[in-house]
Amino acid sequence: YSYRQDGANTYLKRIHYGNRLSRLGVDRRRPLFLDERRAEATDWNFELVFDYGDHDAENPTPRESHPWPSRSDSFSNRRAGFEVRTSRRCERVLMFHHFEELAMPSGCLVRSTDFHYDDGAIYSFLTSVTHKGWRHTGSSYVTQSMPPVEFEYSQPRIGDEVKVADISDGLPMGIDGTTYRMV
């Protein structure tokens, strides 16, 4: 796998699997860790890519083709006093095959899972997920989609009144997570 770093947050970018050549050592054991340099040098059959809006919409490839966009509803979590900001949103998950012997180009898109959102300035909701099949036709792709799985949410009521929260109101105490009470 590989990932991209954005501040303190880490975003999964790609997963490779189905290596053509064995990575077993001379003692017939798997290496404990496969560093990124060796992973990139390995000839993989399958590549799962997480598209955060940085891949072409009509003719995607395994490599990014656009700048990495920020989401309009970025948010932060704080754990042990550190801010972890989420400023990216996965738009699609792309499955690429690397089988030249099947008369398809290396990095041929075969399937995608597309996420559709209802965007707001303060929040966004996942509204549907669509699975697509892709077939390479030489210079472009032909797609067919399954019916989308759709989601509905109750809308939040955001008021102008500021309320004071107090520990006696049942708020969890501390920042280490040991005194949280699940109800």
Residue ranges and their predicted role:
Residues Y1-V183:
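Conserved catalytic cores of ATP-dependent inositol ring kinases
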